[in-house]
């Protein structure tokens, strides 16, 4: 009987021209593929004559071998088997895949419509494992069924004629194989089928490079993921912070999954293009450590002569100061001060000079002054010695930052040589002496007493004893004396003395005298000192009589008795008040001790959340509560202002937070969690919980009422109305509250100005504990599985890995500081969340707000350290803010504003070099929008008009604050640069 189909060759041609499916991503290792066979397959047929048959078709000059079977015309049950040759599996893969390409004819397409009796459209796949080839014995009972193969699409004669026959592809897997090889068998129960190709293969994870680590070819395991350790590429090391050797996991499908850890290029190398290796830094570039992403160009006056440098060495004559890193430019000592000059007033000398012409590339120049006293003229070689302790320099003789110094205590008739040296932090590293300028001075003949004061030693009705500070001549033969000029309303006279001391006699009692003094030298008199007034004593009074003495004594005794009575009365009243205060303190302490003795817990530990809340909060009677106006609302509840009147207590204003009955269960849980957390604290800077209502709907949380509301809105309404000291005090309160939270192992996770409340005394309190969680310990972490994250306030590690710690709250506190100092501005302006995340990863940090004190901005930057271990703790932040509050002068230094760092606005399509299209847009970006009307009034409507503005122009426009002028002019200079 003919076993081939009608039109079989045409059908095969259509099948051979059909497209093959794309390959899988995993690497596939083929064990057998009939489509690539170079000769007849020679598979075992059973029965050999009437069952399956092998056909050959030429395609592009290459023979293609396949099997077909169509026993439809035979009638009755069909039992045709086709067995493959032995397929060697080896010792590697425990799972293999079988891919079949075949076609099946639709039974309804045969004559008669319903199809011949026994016609089917499926066939069966079997397999048998063996360690060797068993020959031509079929051994049907030893085969195990894999699956019944059904066609997704069958064809008809009409499909064949129109060329629309499509190829079916079936893929199945055989797992847990243990023998060295196997056979495949195909059982046809009565379908008209063509087996075009059979491919047997296994999958493996291909050799790859990930995170600068090499991972070899890896076979999947019998089940689950296989962990594979990688090897760092050449010149790469395990990344800082990684938990060990980089690892990836090979999945059963041959794909690499779940990378853990990575490698980084070692110092002196950077990632090559495509991140497939490490290349050495070229000459002139360096990479100092693994925290630096790329090779950096050598700073000014430093060189890297070889590739792969980790540091750039300074050029000859240039140095780095101690503590300066390799990223700092090399500098040199300054040149000598210029134009050293002096002026004298008596024996007081004023030295002045100008800064060095060459500063050496540094701004930390300090000056020191040396003084030598010489006999004769120093230039003529006269002997000189250092000036004695009597010579004083104001403000100091060394460490001067200004270019002037006052010298006092010099001797008349003496020659002095003053040397002014200019130094910076690298001067000590240079072998040569510091550059200096010298000046020789002759103090002349006269001594001035203009800066001295006459002092009264003793006075009597007819005598005055006076003294003053004088000098003794050092040169031989130099005689000094003093002339006094004394006068009153009736007379005046001059008196000569040899010592700086005089006793004036024969004066009038109870009379004022004006006295001044000057020195007399062989070259003439010096100038007079300022006038001083002295008054003699009144004449001695007569003696008291006996009666007067008795009256005085009686009055004294009466006064003493009165004072004793007042003292006894006040002492008793103070004792009663102290006892009352002690009783009150004892009561308060007992109440607080009961509160603080409660363990800090999370609501998660309770099966009934309502019961957990009541363990830390008082259940209030709704009758005690008066609900007033709505002060806030959200999707699942409202916040009201109301009044609470507890039994036997005065009525007080409270805030009432409600939860709608229709809220999801998760919100109900978090609602009670927030009450539980607040109830565990009694801190002046954490919102105080008054009680809860859980036994009636809606559920309510009652807290103290904060008159000024949320901090961000409060600051916007009072822009520039609060002094820096007030802002620091508010930040100190927030830091104190957060220190209390973190000290008890809580992480807030949503610290922002909108969640800080302000009362009428400007006291800030931390609130909104909906996202707050309890950590296992102080250094613990909390890992969330989902939910929204406030990107602009959240630390980078919390965004990337959803891991929250106290350090991530410190990052958020730095953003709150920025909000406070900018009076409620939005962090990062109009940047999108994606831009914010990328900018932070690139090292961008918020610029200082307008007029931000430099110490506060430094504190912000410390909070924004990328490495969370480098961020300060809240206790350190609290101490630092307390120190700033006690030293208000430190807040006068304003943080430098970099004009190149501005917050991007939506439109950046200005003219070339000016990334703003309007003046108002530019002023907003540098936080100077308050001056928009000033610019409009001055007719400055375009950005080109502002490029030539000067400080005088700004003053005429009404912009007079120096800090604001500096910010505007720096931004304009940034456009020009």
Curated annotation (Swiss-Prot):
Q: Which residues form the signal peptide?
A: 1-26
Q: What happens when the gene is disrupted?
A: Mice display a partially-penetrant uterovaginal and tail development defects. The uterovaginal defect is due to a defect in apoptosis during development.
Q: Does the keyword Transcription apply?
A: no
Report motif location: PDZ-binding. 975-977
EC numbers on record = 2.7.10.1
Q: Which residue intervals define the domain Eph LBD in the entry?
A: 28-210
The source's domain of life comes to Eukaryota
Tissue specificity? Preferentially expressed in epithelial cells including skin, kidney, liver and thymus. Expressed in myogenic progenitor cells.
Q: Which GO terms describe its biological process?
A: angiogenesis; cell surface receptor protein tyrosine kinase signaling pathway; negative regulation of cell migration; positive regulation of angiogenesis; positive regulation of cell migration; positive regulation of cell-matrix adhesion; positive regulation of stress fiber assembly; substrate adhesion-dependent cell spreading
| Glycan-linked positions | 415, 479
Q: What GO molecular function annotation could you give as one example from this UniProt entry? A: fibronectin binding
Q: Name one Pfam family in it.
A: SAM_1
Q: Does the keyword Ribonucleoprotein apply?
A: no
Q: Which CDD domains match?
A: EphR_LBD_A1, FN3, SAM_EPH-A1, TM_EphA1
Bilayer-spanning residue ranges: 549-569
Task: Name the keywords, alphabetized.
Answer: Angiogenesis, ATP-binding, Cell adhesion, Cell membrane, Glycoprotein, Kinase, Membrane, Nucleotide-binding, Phosphoprotein, Receptor, Repeat, Signal, Transferase, Transmembrane, Transmembrane helix, Tyrosine-protein kinase, Ubl conjugation
* Localization terms from the record: Cell membrane
Q: What does this protein do?
A: Receptor tyrosine kinase which binds promiscuously membrane-bound ephrin-A family ligands residing on adjacent cells, leading to contact-dependent bidirectional signaling into neighboring cells. The signaling pathway downstream of the receptor is referred to as forward signaling while the signaling pathway downstream of the ephrin ligand is referred to as reverse signaling. Binds with a low affinity EFNA3 and EFNA4 and with a high affinity to EFNA1 which most probably constitutes its cognate/functional ligand.
What the record says about family reads:
Belongs to the protein kinase superfamily. Tyr protein kinase family. Ephrin receptor subfamily.
What is the name attached to this protein's record?
Answer: Ephrin type-A receptor 1
Q: Which gene encodes it?
A: Epha1
